[in-house]
């Protein structure tokens, strides 16, 4: 349950931050120090990072984008803002070491946020893509304790190399698909009914939109990509704000984040 003093919450997902996305990473850091300051709670619903191969990533090598983001989140949390992070399909290996370094809490997927009596289902969204059977099989495997333990026992350079190979394979598979798998609205409706809720917020699909169906709202978050060509449809960075006083959902472009490098 959200503390009764919370009035303004910000939701983001699919930022895919890392050394490979310098403009997006810089934009998020600017936003965190500006517009995001108004939020009592920040909810990052998956894929904060493009890849995460283990919390020991923060203990080796010279500081990079991963270190910068974690330090900024820690400073943000230290100033009194609650930071909640959910696993995505890219950074499902985030663990308590990361959470401790960032002064953040890890959210289960899915979970229910109770804000002033309103129950809101939060999820990354990948588990709703029921038509993508191969991915769901992979998801079940890599979220298992046995697979993760085996992967994390490998040396860090080997894990980084494997993660890069998996991302390349994923991009190749997506390029061969006629359409990307989308969230199943019937599955989402079942989740909402099971949670006794009428609201859902998720990301993953990179298709920001409000979906209304039989009095149920499914709000899909935007991805962030400030490294894409300026002016293009994919050059965007948006946060969803929920204001408790009016229970208003407002998707806002992040002006501080969208300054082109």
Predicted feature residues:
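Hydrophobic/basic alpha-helical segments enriched in Actinobacteria
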Residues: 14, 20, 39, 107, ...
